[in-house]
Regions:
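Short strand-turn-strand beta-turns centered on an Asx-Gly dipeptide
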Residues: 363-367, 532, 848-851
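Secretory targeting and sorting signals
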Residues: 1-39
Length: 890
């Protein structure tokens, strides 16, 4: 059939199927399965742990891409040698299922969150057995069908898979199971299967400890585990370029292009974008409806497309060649021709396509079928002067391809491959595979690029593995899909390709006004930490159009007004949309305007920077006039809802909307109003009618706000309650951070469908480095920076923060009994900054590299130290020049 349906847009966040669940996750250096803890064990486990002096011991990244299970949780039925499947195991495992007997089942534990392509090596079989495998992140959610919701974007559409076993072979799952700790193997049909090995081919980022450019270590084992759990959570959500397997495979000695809806089922060769004149020859066998191929393709969404409809095609015109121009996913017919004879399914045919100048000729089994003149295309069609080749099968269409050869106009072989072995697949970007690196929201679900999640994930990346390319490419994809209104979509499939043509018509798309604005905040954060001005320049027009669209949503009060059911959704997808003047949305808009001003300055547009600054100032005034409630001392949910919102008040403090004199009161009232569970704050007061779920995403903003405001004690309490709970031993511990938490009992908040490795929950990683260790950029690319530790009850912390100029390392110790603080800062070349050291009062003494620079409230310059002042319990020292600054206070 011809181009009937495009991939449906992303539905609202989360799983709309069976009951949702969250998962308890974390830190997995424990290779044993989680079990019920006895009283004696509990006493041992709650003693203060010994903190290692080597931060590398906290890193959880799999050492090898072939991940093996570490323990057998249980077996039922006739199972022999289950432990032989574990890491380092020898021998084999046999499962036997008789018609009258119990089905054999093995529940395996991989020790922590992992994900990729499950595989099973069968060494023997008897009868006609069917192997079945199910997957779960948390142990309590394992069922015969796995743990619930599969992703709507990338990955296997089911949490279990079945495989008819025909004989000895390694069975590899065709699609990714992106996140699981537990795997249940059974037989669903009678027979016997002997397995010599099972495992998962890990496909996410696998940066080892040696590649971590940022690291953190403190006197608190819990905080250390939280930091590295956040870093590993991020890694499970990072997908390297071309790592997603796509929908193609090698079957029966040929490339099997089973129908896909991603990128309309099209995939292209990873070379040849500059090829102009050539002949591409291949053999094809239609298995259902049609066989499609592309020529002069720039990517799967741009090029010439040809489709052979077989004699039984149910959606198109049987025995027809369709010819189309595809531009940014829009299809325009440039011709069609009846085939000279019927084309039967299951028969092999040879196709030759010659592109030369403005002509395209197609031969079928050596017989000319048609010639297309691309200099005289119909209205709406786009001509392509160069590009590579590819194949396309959409939906339930299916065809096989082999013996591909591409020869240039002068007779040179450009590419030749029989397409009979799996080694051929990496030459292509098939539908479902990703041409560029990207960051997903969750390892299991949704497995999509989400702009709001990137705001947290980007910071986690910059402070840990420091692979900003994942963030950059994700933002590039989002920006390329901007609508004509200026609205930037908030969610994309990771296999999406960049939009190359004019802006797509429309006012709004997935997901909401806030997720559209997050693009600006994400880009500003990327620029602040990387200094990549070239990328800012490229995206600057996108920023301008986005902020122009935001301005169209201002109401008569000068506040952003959203529409429920149109653009009023936000992070709490399980609650109803919010319409009207929503406090949190307006505060995010305020931040977007400030970020827009910073990006305008980077792009050299100083007048626009000034305009955004003025708009932000006016918006701040209106927010405080209309949405702040002086009676409660807090910001309302909206102009129509007077309840308390965690996001609005935390963001008001963090982004400076709230006057400095009111910030301490806001944080105090916020704790009194919402800190009512042992697992962290409720995101809304009970009168708002929202679900009783703790949000690590929103709590991350509150964590940053409290640290920025100097409320370190409550920040540490928040860290323990929310993230300490997720890393504690339990049936849902995965070594990673959960999407949300039930305020009732601390279980995963939405049931078995929840993501237990969710990047938006990793704020502590950047917060601990940025505030507790104390390293933050002041200007783009760390040209200037601040080191200001917030020690709380810690006695020491040390770590490293990567910058474009080199590492910035910090080591501090606190002796509160003696009111002494020692701080060593190693600074990168070509930078300057501020070192703020805690002091007991204005009259304290501060020494830098042996020179007294502060005593009795007065500053004295020293080598590399140019200014000093006292403020809020710190002496702030301006320093310049690379080197080591050893600073002490008493």
């Amino acid at each position: 059939m011809i181009i009937s349906g495009r991939r449906r847009p992303p539905r609202r966040r989360g799983w709309a199927g069976a009951t949702f669940a969250l998962g308890l996750a974390l830190i997995v250096a424990a290779l044993t399965q989680p079990v019920a803890v006895s009283a004696a064990e509990h006493t041992t486990q709650t003693r203060t742990p010994q903190v290692t002096t080597d931060w590398r011991q906290y890193v959880q990244t799999p050492k090898h891409s072939d991940v093996c299970p570490v323990s057998v949780v249980s077996t039922t039925g006739p199972v022999e040698g289950a432990r032989n499947l574990l890491c380092g195991g020898t021998g084999s495992t046999t499962l036997t299922y008789t018609a009258e007997g119990e089905a054999p089942t093995i529940l395996l534990d991989y020790g922590q969150e992992t994900g990729g392509l499950p595989y099973f090596t069968v060494s023997a079989k008897s009868g006609s057995p069917t192997l079945k495998a199910a997957y779960s992140e948390g142990r309590e959610y394992m069922s015969p069908s796995g743990d619930g919701a599969a992703p709507w974007a990338d990955g296997d559409s089911s949490r279990f898979d079945t495989y008819p076993v025909s004989g000895p072979a390694t069975i590899t799952n065709r699609y990714a199971q992106g996140g699981e700790r537990y795997e249940q193997i059974t037989l669903s049909d009678p027979g016997r299967v002997t397995l010599s090995k099972v495992g998962i081919k890990y496909i996410a980022d696998r940066t080892q400890a040696s590649g971590y450019q940022g690291h953190f270590l403190s006197s608190s084992d819990e905080l250390n585990k939280i930091w590295y759990a956040g870093a590993y959570t991020l890694q499970t959500d990072l997908v390297p370029a071309n790592s997603l397997p796509g929908s193609w495979s090698i079957q029966d000695g040929a490339l099997s292009a089973g129908g896909s809806r991603v990128n309309d089922g099209a995939g292209v060769l990873n070379r040849g974008s500059s090829w102009s004149d050539y002949t591409a020859t291949f053999r094809t066998r239609i298995l259902h409806d049609q066989a499609g191929w592309m020529a002069r393709a720039q990517n799967s969404q741009n090029g010439y497309l040809f489709i052979l409809d077989d004699s039984t095609d149910t959606g198109g015109a049987p025995n027809t060649l369709q010819e189309l121009s595809v531009h940014d996913g829009a299809y325009t017919s440039i011709g069609s021709v009846a085939l000279p004879s019927p084309l039967a399914e299951g028969t092999w045919h040879t196709v030759a396509t010659t592109v030369s100048g403005t002509g395209i000729s197609i031969l079928l089994d050596g017989q000319p079928i048609d010639h297309v003149d691309t200099s005289a295309l119909p209205a709406g069609a786009v001509a392509f002067p160069s590009g590579t080749i590819g194949f396309r099968e959409f939906g339930d269409e299916e065809a096989s391809f082999k013996d591909l050869t591409v020869v240039s106009g002068n007779g040179k072989t450009l590419y030749s491959n029989p397409l009979t072995a799996s080694a051929s697949l990496p030459d292509f970007t098939p539908p479902g595979s990703n041409a560029v690196a990207s960051v997903l929201d969750g390892a299991r679900r949704d497995r999509a690029i989400w702009s709001g999640d990137i705001l947290v994930e980007g910071l986690t990346d910059y402070y840990s593995v420091n692979n900003p390319e994942y963030i950059k490419q994700s933002l590039d994809l989002l920006g390329s899909r901007q609508l004509s209104s200026g609205f930037v979509p908030g969610a994309l499939h990771p296999a999406s390709v960049a939009h190359l043509g004019p802006l797509t018509p429309g006012e709004t798309a997935s997901y909401s006004a806030t997720y559209s604005m997050y693009f600006v905040a994400d880009l500003a954060s990327y620029y602040l930490h990387t200094g990549d001005k070239d990328f800012v320049t490229k995206e600057w027009p996108v920023v301008q159009r986005e902020l122009a669209w935001n301005a169209t949503r201002l109401d008569g009060n000068g506040l952003l007004s959203t529409r429920a059911g149109v653009d009023g959704a936000d992070w709490d997808f399980y609650d109803t949309d919010k319409g009207g003047e929503v406090s949190a949305y307006n505060i995010l808009y305020y931040k977007a305007l400030l970020d827009g001003a910073a990006l305008a300055t980077a792009a050299g547009d100083t007048s626009q920077a000034a305009a955004y600054q003025a708009d932000a100032g006016a918006l701040q005034k209106r927010i405080n006039e209309r949405l702040y409630d002086p009676t409660s001392g807090l910001y309302k949910i909206s102009d129509t809802q007077s309840g308390v919102a965690q996001d609005a008040n935390a963001l008001a403090v963090l982004y400076g909307v709230a006057p400095a004199a009111k910030q301490a009161e806001i944080l105090s009232e916020l704790k009194s109003s919402l800190w009512s569970t042992p697992y962290g704050p409720h995101p809304f007061s009970s009168d708002a009618g929202n679900k009783d779920l703790v949000s690590p995403f929103v709590s991350g903003f509150e964590l940053q706000a409290r640290l920025a405001a100097g409320d370190t004690a409550n920040a540490q309490e928040l860290l323990h309650d929310v993230w300490g709970h997720m890393i504690a031993p339990g049936p849902n511990q995965t070594g990673t951070m959960w999407e949300n938490i039930s305020g009732q009992d601390g279980t995963p908040g939405l049931g078995s469908g929840a993501s237990l490795s969710h990047g938006w929950s990793t704020a502590p990683t950047s917060a601990l480095s940025g505030y507790v260790l104390g390293v933050r950029p002041d200007t783009a690319g760390y040209r200037t920076w601040t080191v200001q530790p917030h020690p709380g009850d810690l006695t020491w912390t040390r770590g490293n923060v990567p910058t474009p100029h080199g590492d910035l390392s910090v080591n501090w110790t606190a002796d509160k009994g003696k009111n002494q603080f020692s701080l060593t800062v190693n600074t990168p070349e070509g930078t300057s900054g501020t070192i703020a050291i805690p002091v007991s009062g204005r009259t304290g003494t501060v020494v830098v590299n042996g020179d007294v620079v502060w005593r009795h409230g007065s500053f004295a310059a020293a080598a590399g130290v140019t200014q000093g002042q006292f403020e809020s319990g710190y002496v702030h020292l301006k320093v310049k020049g690379n080197g080591t600054f050893k600073v002490t206070s008493h």
